[in-house]
Amino acid sequence: MASPAVLAAKAALASVDLSKYDPEQSRLMDERCILVDENDIAIGAMDKKTCMYCHLMDNINKGLLHRAFSVFIFRPSDGRLLLQQRASEKITFPDRWTNTCCSHPLDDFEAEKNEKDQLGVKIAGSRKLEHELGIPQSQTPIGQFQYLTRIHYLAPSNDMWGEHEVDYILFLTRDVTVEPNPNEVRAYKYVNKEELKAMFEDPSINFTPWFKLIARDFLFGWWDELLKRKGSDGQVVAQSLADLMDDRVIKMA
């Protein structure tokens, strides 16, 4: 039997019209998210068209929560971070700057449900890097993603939409070919730490809430360690941070 939270989300379907949004972004709502509890235990699946209504601010407090990931790609030679600006067509957080790629593992793909060594979210990360940024999956081998932790956060996008996720943080150090999908990505650039801090201080630049939370509490410390732990060839290597992995679900506020 469906939980009260799921029933509430389904009931909301009648009240929101997706036809006013970009057709491709609306089509992607048919993908099935993985629903989890606050301990990141999978409890079912729901297509985004329904799951999206756990993103309605009216429903967020009713308990729907889903699994997500945030990938951070650093250039090996200089440790610069690849950022993207989300496309104007995005339903949530359009035009905001964020980390390299943020999305969801899907129940549609058996491999993306694999929880051993975070394989499912790593496979999903490689898939979405290609979809959003045109980075060939051959350039993002699953074994080179470094998992660091999971965060549980809640954030509004506007008066109607919000976000409520258990988000896996993945670092990757690779030279990649970027050919953005314009329906997903408006712009992209590589930045060093000082340039990113300057962006955060610029009131004209808007960021996604999860990126701001990760940067506030974790990113710059991890980044410092990444730069300190360069290999003998002078390049940064994500796996050098393996000892910093924290497998708790960290509740962010």
What are these regions (language model features)?
Residues 28-30:
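Short, small/polar residue-rich loop motifs at catalytic or cofactor-binding pockets
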Residues 2-17, 97, 101, 107, ...:
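Nudix hydrolase/Nudix homology domain
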